[in-house]
């Protein structure tokens, strides 16, 4: 089976990352999804988390199915790029990717980069897509045409992926990327994959036995592509990344395909009977093949199998020329350059890369569209609030005027002698139906608790940010320039601004609460009177004498005006509801604008849409205000006439004052209750917003803590690696110096070492057994830690034995006094003539001779070495048996 030595880029590796919590939190904070959509989004987040684990953390087979998983994950990342922002400030998720080419070392781990950025994740996944494409292409068997076509296609797609990544990587990775993601590295990989794609096309042509003219162009272009790849791979910035085999194979294939191009051109020359040029090109081909042997391994049989054909063709052509043609061999330098044909090109990358891709987050709109929709909602809310406030202020103004005129209570006084006017009965009943003064007091009592709850959330949020900043400042102060991550001030600016914004909102709300409280105190007496039962309310109002006038035309006219005013207030309530409930789906307009221009002119689109759907409502509001203006003038004119008619009335000034106060209190109650309910709703609505802000800050602090721990771990590893490397270097230097010192002493020791003693003479056979040694001495010797008994005779015979104890068979190794030696001992061979061991080293604790041995001199003492040197302060000695 022919092999072609195709190269494939390695995959980047990463760690497991939990996407569920941060993505769910971000979606809840940003998007107001319905209950049905919320369940769909939660399911999509879970599916995305599983997809990442499968695509990035599990082993990938060199198969199209594994590539489909990677491309699907990448397409999903692109789809949510504008929907779910992942950044260090908005939605921090730490992605850690290791360098694909760095294998690490004994003292350091693989180079890696950790960033809280979704674009960094996309860049790493895109690199792995290009790498896996190259691996699948290189793994083809090249037995069939389909396999060759698949290989050429995948190599071109891989080249396109690396080329695209080269152009955009610096914009996707905000910090300096790892070496595998540097533009020069990606350019070299793209050039290499393009060369291999052209080579696959050459293999297809060679298999199909294409014409020599075509093979010349294809092979010459293969050599050209490999030459470009070799130049890019030889740059200083990327030269250290590649394995030695890579550089050798690329250089070898550059030469080999130059040789093949010359060989195929020689075939063309042979067909044209250009023997001189044919011989020159064949000789150059052989020369190039000989040079390629220095780089290209012999196991790449797909190329080396052609080499015998070149050699054979050269021999045949030379023979024919020598015997038949006798043409002069052309000078190769004068020959024209070979034509080239570019058949392989990097395939432009298209998204989505997965056929029939389906976005799991289709219910979410891009953040730009979402922001535009929020701006539209803000404009719409501003319009609704403005029109509502205009109507409410006008209503309050009208009610104030009527209360100052004591209308409609004054009309009841002229037609009835009842102390409590009918209009006040209705107002009191309505006020008590709404809860009366107790309801107002209850709402007031809840506001401080609601305010304090939101204030506590903001305080805790600020505390989390401050603690994170203090921790970062402490580490930066301790480690200085080694602490390379971004400072907290650079990242927390938007969060601090948001906290300040909500503090300002709370302060404004607190001031509004005080104003409402003051207004309540000014109308408290009237509200409390209206909250009493009818008899108590009647007793608090001064009575009146018989009325002076009856149902006059002026009274009837005023009653008609009051009825018209009631109709106006009823219409305004309906108008307020219509303003609040008017909605439209403007998302399609924004999506269309974004698809056409990649930009959204939100102001123009929003204003045009608002004018379209709110134009008629605004006209009705203005008509209501105009009607009120006319009606107010008519009421004031009629009231002047009415006041003149009732001049002789017996109604006292105190009664009129009380009736006016109660009328104003009734109107104030409605406003106060609405204000307090609105304030309660405001605080309750603000709480989840602040909780989401607190969660966002907590996620940011957690991500920063994870980043901090990872950076500290890397710093510790670098410190430990540096210490370990220093220790190894010091150890090697120590060994080298000790070896040199020992070698010098060993060279001097033979002159000072004692001569080797003669071998022992065998003892004469004896009928009687030798006298055993004393039992006392044996018992002492049997105790490992016991010192030998004092023997002056032995000390005289062996004064040097006390220098140090040595292990038998091992030299230059002093042993500690009185300790057993667990080393190997010579095997005991018993004899009938020696019931006790009588050879040196039999008792390892102490090297002594028995008295009979000393007398007979049958055994020599243990060899002593370096004694003179030791006594003279010299170094270690050499082995005396050398």
UniProtKB/Swiss-Prot annotation:
Biased composition (Gly residues): 872-882
Region described as Disordered: spans on this chain: 743-882
Gene Ontology process terms (BP): endocytic recycling; endosome organization; mitotic cytokinesis; protein localization to organelle; regulation of protein catabolic process
Disulfide bonds: none
One Gene Ontology molecular-function label: Notch binding
Bias type Pro residues, positions: 752-763
GO cellular component: basolateral plasma membrane; cytoplasmic vesicle; endosome; multivesicular body; organelle; recycling endosome
Domain of life: Eukaryota
InterPro entries: ALIX_V_dom, BRO1_dom, BRO1_sf
BRO1 domain span: 5-398
Compositionally biased residues, Low complexity: 791-830, 847-871
Function: Required for lin-12 degradation after it has been internalised in the vulval precursor cells.
The protein, known as: Apoptosis-linked gene 2-interacting protein X 1
Organism: Caenorhabditis elegans
């Amino acid at each position: 089976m022919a092999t072609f030595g195709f190269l494939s880029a390695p995959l980047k590796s990463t760690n497991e990352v939990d996407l569920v919590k941060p993505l769910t939190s971000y979606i809840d904070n940003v998007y107001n999804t319905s209950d049905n959509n919320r369940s769909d989004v939660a399911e999509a987040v879970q599916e995305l988390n599983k997809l990442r684990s499968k695509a990035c953390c599990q082993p990938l087979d060199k198969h199209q199915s594994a590539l489909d998983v990677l491309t699907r994950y990448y397409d999903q990342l692109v789809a949510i790029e504008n929907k779910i922002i992942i950044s260090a400030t908005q939605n921090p998720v730490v992605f850690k990717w290791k360098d694909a080419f760095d294998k690490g070392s004994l003292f350091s781990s693989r180079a890696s980069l950790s960033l809280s950025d979704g674009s960094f994740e996309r860049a790493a996944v895109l690199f792995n897509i290009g790498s896996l494409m190259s691996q699948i292409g290189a793994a083809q068997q090249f037995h069939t045409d389909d396999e060759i076509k698949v290989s050429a296609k995948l190599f071109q797609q891989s080249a396109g992926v690396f080329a695209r990544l080269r152009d955009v990587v610096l914009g996707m990775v905000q910090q300096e990327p790892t070496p595998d993601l540097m533009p020069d590295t990606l350019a070299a990989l793209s050039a290499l994959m393009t060369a291999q794609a052209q080579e696959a096309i050459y293999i297809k042509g060679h298999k199909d036995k294409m014409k020599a003219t075509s093979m010349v162009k294809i092979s010459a272009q293969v050599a050209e592509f490999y030459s470009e790849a070799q130049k890019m791979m030889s740059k200083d910035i990327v030269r250290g990344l590649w394995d030695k085999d890579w550089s050798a194979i690329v250089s070898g294939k550059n030469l080999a395909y130059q040789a093949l191009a010359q060989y195929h051109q020689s075939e063309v020359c042979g067909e044209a009977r250009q023997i001189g040029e044919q011989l020159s090109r064949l000789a150059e081909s052989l020369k190039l093949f000989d040079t390629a042997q220095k780089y290209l391994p012999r196991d790449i049989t797909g190329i080396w199998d052609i080499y015998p054909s070149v050699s054979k063709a050269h021999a045949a052509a030379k023979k024919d020329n020598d015997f038949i043609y006798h043409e002069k061999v052309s000078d190769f330098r004068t020959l024209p350059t070979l034509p080239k044909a570019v058949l392989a090109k990097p395939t432009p990358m298209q998204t989505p890369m997965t056929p029939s891709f389906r976005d799991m987050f289709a219910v979410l709109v891009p953040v730009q569209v979402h922001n535009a929709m929020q701006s539209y909602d803000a404009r719409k809310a501003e319009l609704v609030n403005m029109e509502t406030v205009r109507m409410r202020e006008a209503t309050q103004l009208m009610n104030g005027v009527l209360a100052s005129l004591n209308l409609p209570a004054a009309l009841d006084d002229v037609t009835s002698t009842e102390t409590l006017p009918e209009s006040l009965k209705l107002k009191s009943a309505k006020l008590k139906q709404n809860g009366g003064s107790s309801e107002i007091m209850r709402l007031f009592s809840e506001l401080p608790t609601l305010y304090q709850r939101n204030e506590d959330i903001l305080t805790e949020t600020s505390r989390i940010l401050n603690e994170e900043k203090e921790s970062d400042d402490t580490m930066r102060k301790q480690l200085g320039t080694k602490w390379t991550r971004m400072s907290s001030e650079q990242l927390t600016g938007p969060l601090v601004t948001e906290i300040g914004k909500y503090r300002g909102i709370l302060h404004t709300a607190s001031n509004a609460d005080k104003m409402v409280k003051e207004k309540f105190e000014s109308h408290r007496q009237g509200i409390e009177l209206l909250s009493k039962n009818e008899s108590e309310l009647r007793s608090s109002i001064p009575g009146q004498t018989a009325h002076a006038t009856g149902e006059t035309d002026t009274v009837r006219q005023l009653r008609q005006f009051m009825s018209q005013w009631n109709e106006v207030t009823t219409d305004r309530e309906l108008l307020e509801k219509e303003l609040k409930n008017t909605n439209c789906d403007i998302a399609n307009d924004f999506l269309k604008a974004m698809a056409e221009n990649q930009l959204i002119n939100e102001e123009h689109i929003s204003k045009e849409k608002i004018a379209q759907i709110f134009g008629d409502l605004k006209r009705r509001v203005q008509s209501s205000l105009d009607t009120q203006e006319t009606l107010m003038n008519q009421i004031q004119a009629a009231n002047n006439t009415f006041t003149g008619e009732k001049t002789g009335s017996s109604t006292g000034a105190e009664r009129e004052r009380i009736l006016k106060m109660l009328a104003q209190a009734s109107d104030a109650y409605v406003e106060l209750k609405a204000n307090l309910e609105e304030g309660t709703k405001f605080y309750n609505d603000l709480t989840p917003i602040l909780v989401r802000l607190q969660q966002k800050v907590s996620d940011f602090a957690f991500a920063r803590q994870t980043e901090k721990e990872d950076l500290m771990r890397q710093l510790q590893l670098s410190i430990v690696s540096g210490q370990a490397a220093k220790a190894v270097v010091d150890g090697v230097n120590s060994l080298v110096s000790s070896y040199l010192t020992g070698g010098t002493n060993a060279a001097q020791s033979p002159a000072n070492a004692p001569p080797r003693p003669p071998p022992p003479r065998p003892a004469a056979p004896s009928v009687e057994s030798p006298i055993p040694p004393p039992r006392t001495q044996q018992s002492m010797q049997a105790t490992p830690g016991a010192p030998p008994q004092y023997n002056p005779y032995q000390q005289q015979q062996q004064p040097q034995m006390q220098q140090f104890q040595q292990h038998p068979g091992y030299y230059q190794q002093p042993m500690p006094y009185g300790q057993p030696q667990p080393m190997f001992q010579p095997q005991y061979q018993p004899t009938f003539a020696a019931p006790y061991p009588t050879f040196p080293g039999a008792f390892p604790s102490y090297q002594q001779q028995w008295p009979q041995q000393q007398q007979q001199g049958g055994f020599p003492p243990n060899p002593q070495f370096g004694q003179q040197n030791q006594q003279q302060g010299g170094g270690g000695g050499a082995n005396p048996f050398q």
